[in-house]
UniProtKB/Swiss-Prot annotation:
GO terms for cellular component: chloroplast; chloroplast inner membrane; chloroplast thylakoid membrane; thylakoid membrane. Pathway: Porphyrin-containing compound metabolism; chlorophyll biosynthesis. Pfam families: PaO (PF08417), Rieske (PF00355). Residues 1-36 form a transit peptide. Keywords: 2Fe-2S, Chlorophyll biosynthesis, Chloroplast, Coiled coil, Iron, Iron-sulfur, Membrane, Metal-binding, NADP, Oxidoreductase, Plastid, Thylakoid, Transit peptide. This is Chlorophyllide a oxygenase, chloroplastic. Consists of three domains A, B and C. The C-terminal C domain possesses catalytic function while the N-terminal A domain confers protein instability in response to chlorophyll b accumulation.
Amino acid sequence: MNAAVFSPSALSLPISFSKTRSSFLSRKKGVKGEFRVFAVFGDESGLVEKKSQWRPLFDVEDPRSKAPPYKGKFLDVNQAIEVARFDIQYLDWRARQDLLTIMILHDKVVDVLNPLAREYKSIGTVKKELAGLQEELSKAHQQVHISEARVSTALDKLAHMEELVNDRLLPGRVVTELDKPSSSTTASAVELDREKTNTGAKSLNVSGPVPPYSPHLKNFWYPVAFTADLKHDTMVPIECFEQPWVIFRGEDGKPGCVRNTCAHRACPLDLGTVNEGRIQCPYHGWEYSTDGECKKMPSTKLLKVKIKSLPCLEQEGMIWIWPGDEPPAPILPSLQPPSGFLIHAELVMDLPVEHGLLLDNLLDLAHAPFTHTSTFAKGWSVPSLVKFLTPTSGLQGYWDPYPIDMEFKPPCIVLSTIGISKPGKLEGKSTQQCATHLHQLHVCLPSSKNKTRLLYRMSLDFAPILKNLPFMEHLWRHFAEQVLNEDLRLVLGQQERMLNGANIWNLPVAYDKLGVRYRLWRNAVDRGDDKLPFSG
């Protein structure tokens, strides 16, 4: 990669703030550009304190004092990526400040329109104040759109730089290591087995190459896409249990799922188009309905041809398929957030991890203060004891001392509700005792032996204004990717060791209870047991 010279990033324009502390909004022009930015301080009227329920979103340290010291220097690859990542960190903070400004301006408008306040003001004064606030809001919204563009550009830039680095420095490494594992047991695995024998601890055996999927694991309904991602003229290609499928809407608007391979010459159908509820192959124009039947063969006689299709349903904003051979279960599980929550983000990502390993990670919270030190667990203390409290026969419970409820919902779903009144402070509160909450849905669809399609949905029971701000989709995706990246480097390391023979469940302890129960459930499914554990 060519060397680069660092100059103050166009994405991180310097911003001036008023040094005086007041309850009003201070404005100064940035050193560059003609747009205005806003700083918010609050001692007198307590506006910031008034929004304490939103503090988790805005309690982020100003990162500008930690800018990389590379101004005017030639950069190597790692330094260039460090600068790009700093841009992302700065934009994260900047976007939060823009949002807080709009929220406080909105409250000031409400205060001006308050009938009690108007009793002491003339109509002219009220009009003047509203006109001023309207101007402030207009400029603040303009800044939000600028932030949105910056976020998009910064994320694209970082992704491009990381792709270049991977191409230049890491060609084929991951594929070689993960796709061609050694079947022999490593020395470290032998040591772990010896330690297990000495301690007498009970372990699960999860080691070696990922075995073929049990047909019994396929006999469940699997969520594969969000309704919002499947328009009438779009397709969603997926991989499920190492088979390619494509989802699209039929003429009646209902979703269907067919094998993503044309019966004629095996061309991927998702490269084509959807015409009047039929998917058209881009090679010779053959068209298929949602049940897999070929309805059109241009330039030749229509033959009776059908490709494989799967049962496919739509419920509560999600698309589901049944990939198994048994008749589909008559009822789909509900994955809706609890009453009072509003969905703010729905994201889909493909991750290079076996889906069971990813579920192990999501069902474990004890790792948070050690792994997520730069995201949601920043500042968390390490408790002397972490416990997961659950019914004897359940796959759900709550974490002590964390205010978090969690549930594993077969076959591959994790639901969690997190109390976020005071992030970074552990006070032993239960989820119910917290005033504000984050609800998360994680779906870990088994794409292939070393690949997972992750569906993530985030809901809040506060700050509904965030739903309508234009840049929030980028911001939520950035947050989710930050957290996942902290996990992935560890889980990929586990996967490499596992493929080489190490047992990743060699020595479970008390706080591993939910993960162990998932593995016991999974083993019973793979065996084809009539009665599954923790199911009643």
